[in-house]
Every structure is written in structure tokens, then in C-alpha cells.
Amino acid sequence: MKAFTEPLLSLAGFEEMTKTAEKSSGLISVTGCIDAQKSQMIYAFGGHRKNKLIVTFGEQKAKELYDEYSFFDKEVVYYPSKDVLFYQSDIRGNLLTAERIRALKAIREQERVTLVTTFDALMNTCLLYTSDAADE
């Protein structure tokens, strides 16, 4: 994968962005790169980080980013948003529910994980899992 990340490391803008991110904690927002380069940029920028959350504006864009980013990182999962229309959820069956469960399971069980989702899905409420509930 160094063939994809090495060219970025030599760019002054990328180096400055990396230094700024290391000094600060919390959210990192990067804008201005073209769609074809986003997955490569995310991988090079956050490759050393244990967990990554990639949030985008729409369902289609999240799926595209998931497909592209899975080339770089095998520990990537996609968390879809809920269907607003009953018609859409009826067509897909339990696929969205299964994808959500798979993503939540990966977050809970894997040491390293990258989650790709949308703003809508990020705002979904989930029940809190505690180990006490499993004992009952």
C-alpha cells in the first residue's frame, strides 16, 4: 500500500494537515479533494489510527466510499441509515437491519475498525448494551 501513500507524504499540504491533526484532538474535517482521491487520502491520513469514522452526506456516497475504501482497509464496515419510506424497507427486507447489526458487532468486537456512514445514520438512536443485561 506504500505505492498509494508515499506520493501523498511528500506533499507539503498533506504534511501540514498531518501535523495539525496530531496537535489537536477530536474531529478532523478535510475538504477540497476530488472524489477519486478521497479513499486514498483517508487511508494515508488515518492509516495509523486505531478507529476511524467516515461520515458523508448521502447513502449513495457512503456506499461508494465504503466500496473504494475496502480496497485499502479490510476492517471497514458500512452502517446504513434507516429507510424513511415503508416501501423501500419492504423491498430490501432485512438487509439493512443485518448490515447495521454487522457494523455494531464489528465496533464492539474488533480492535481496529473503520465505520462508513451518513449523517442520518449517525443520528439514529440505539439501545445501550451492557454486560449486565446479558446475564439475565
Please state what every model-predicted region is.
Residues 1-131:
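ASCE RecA-like P-loop NTPase motor cores
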Residues 132-136:
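A short, hydrophobic C-terminal helix/tail in secreted or cell-surface proteins
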